[in-house]
Regions:
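Short beta->alpha transition motifs characteristic of CBS
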Residues: 25-31, 145
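Asp-based, Mg2+/Mn2+-dependent phosphohydrolase catalytic module
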Residues: 1-15, 36, 47-49, 53-55, ...
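Conserved phosphate-coupling serine/threonine residues in phosphotransfer and NTP-handling enzymes
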Residues: 72-74
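Conserved phosphoryl-transfer catalytic core
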Residues: 30-44
Length: 208
């Protein structure tokens, strides 16, 4: 689906989202391993809840990117139960399950004639959502979680921040076509984003 603002140069046109830990999380901060010890579709809809602002973010993304896909390693019965229970399936062009996420995304992009340079993966698990995807040549950022803070990566606090992050990326793309340095999402909106303290790398630059 094409964005409403057709005059804006967009840094990322094709967005791929992880499922568990990105769109939905265990209720009341419970460990996911309580569920995965004996997973069933029926228990899944009781154990998990949508993360903060997910529906509003997906609605916004659906109107601003060309492609929105879900890439998950959850078992299909569990994933289907959650997608149907929370009415999430309507937002996605395709739901991809199983396999190396980097390979799956690269294959999807090739089949549809899309560029890796225009694509973004968002997830919470570095070993599944970050490293294999980056290795495949696709940019990836992490949802900030306690369990992934030992890994160096660009981060957002949740999917609810993704539309704003993409907007900053668009601004950066319009301002600097070759090399980009701009404030982080929080600092971009601070009172003095031009100071040294308010200047950090947000958008990865080819060759940087």
């Amino acid at each position: 689906m094409n964005p409403k603002d057709g005059t804006r140069t967009r840094r990322f046109k094709h967005v791929f989202l992880d499922a568990e830990g990105t769109l939905y999380v265990p209720r009341n901060g419970m460990s996911r391993w309580y569920f995965w010890a004996r997973p069933t579709p029926e228990d899944a809809i009781r154990f998990f809840e949508l993360d903060k602002g997910v529906i509003a973010a997906l609605e916004k993304l659906r109107s601003e990117v060309d492609t929105l896909c879900l890439v998950s390693l959850n078992s299909e019965p569990v994933l289907d139960a959650i997608l149907d229970h929370f009415d999430l399936r309507r937002f996605f062009d395709e739901v991809m399950v199983n396999g190396n996420k980097g390979d799956r995304i690269a294959r999807y992009l090739k089949e549809h004639g899309f560029s890796k340079a225009d694509s973004l993966m968002v997830g919470d698990t570095p070993g599944l959502d970050l490293y294999p995807v980056v290795k495949a040549g696709v940019h990836s950022i992490l949802i900030d979680r306690d369990y992934n803070r030992g890994h160096a990566a660009e981060r957002i606090k949740g999917v609810y921040e993704l539309p704003a992050w993409l907007r900053v990326a668009d601004i950066a793309e319009n301002m600097f076509k070759e090399r980009v340095r701009i404030a982080t999402l929080d600092e971009f909106f601070c009172g003095d984003a031009r100071t040294v303290n308010c200047t950090k790398s947000l958008i990865a630059v080819s060759g940087a």
